[in-house]
A protein has these predicted regions:
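Short, positively charged patches
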Residues: 1-145
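Glycine-biased, small-residue-rich flexible motifs in mid-sequence functional cores and linkers
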Residues: 2-3, 83-230
Length: 230
């Protein structure tokens, strides 16, 4: 995927008034984020319903400056920026109307492997719940050892699922509600570091984004969207 497409995808996410579904619609209609900017003057003819206000907003130079800044951060920190047209982008998630235009990824797991399951649950996991999770993954490892385990690195069942996955030699992905410049909760850093060697960390949020409450709701659609079973 070209750097231009990465920059244009990141810039689109920062266009005032466009929103995620609006940006996804433009990229889907024209085939790429780059083409959205190349054809911005005639967007109202190419994509019905696009307002002049949005067309004017696409000239936002600050959006491009921030996009270039973020891509520099990614390059320095060995983070992959996966756009919708990137072959590494989760194909199941791409089918969703609210799919992120770009994902930030550190790790070595194939996000399009055949078997991907989601294990999530309460943040106040009981010993019984933890035991069920552990036994399930132990049994699964004998049947489908190449399964990718996805969760949210949160307290409770999430972190237990990641740790049980690592113990059973699964690759496991943590979908984060913040940028890749931090780990939240901080107590899970050791597990997160292990996951970078046996799975990875994934987010739609740029560096500097805090783990605010609304971001956890947004990230849940990614946890669900990349999985075959959940």
């Amino acid at each position: 995927m070209t750097q231009d497409e990465q920059i244009c995808s990141l810039a689109l996410t920062r266009i005032p008034g466009l929103g995620l579904t609006g940006a996804f619609r433009l990229v889907s209609s024209l085939g790429s984020a780059t083409r959205v900017f190349e054809h911005r003057k005639e967007l109202s003819q190419l994509v019905p319903g696009v307002s002049e206000k949005i067309i004017t907003a696409l000239n936002n130079s600050e959006a491009f400056r921030r996009a270039e800044q973020e891509l520099t951060f990614c390059e320095k920190n060995h983070i992959r920026c996966l756009t919708l047209n990137d072959e590494g982008y989760p194909s199941r998630l791409r089918e969703c109307d609210d799919a992120p235009l770009a994902l930030f990824y550190r790790g070595n797991a194939d996000l399009n492997t055949l078997h991907i399951i989601n294990i999530v649950g309460t943040r106040h996991a009981t010993p019984y719940g933890q035991d069920i999770c552990t036994r399930f993954l132990a049994d699964l490892s004998a049947l489908y050892p190449d399964t990718l385990i996805v969760s949210g690195l949160a307290y409770g069942i999430d972190i237990h699922a990641h740790r049980a996955a690592l113990q059973n030699h699964f690759k496991t992905i943590g979908v984060l509600a913040h940028g890749l410049d931090r780990i939240y909760p901080a107590e899970h850093r050791k597990t997160a570091v292990s996951m970078l060697e046996q799975g990875g960390l994934l987010t739609e949020f740029t560096s500097g984004t805090n783990p605010d409450r609304q971001n956890f709701v947004k990230r849940n659609r990614i946890v669900a969207g990349i999985c075959l079973l959940y």
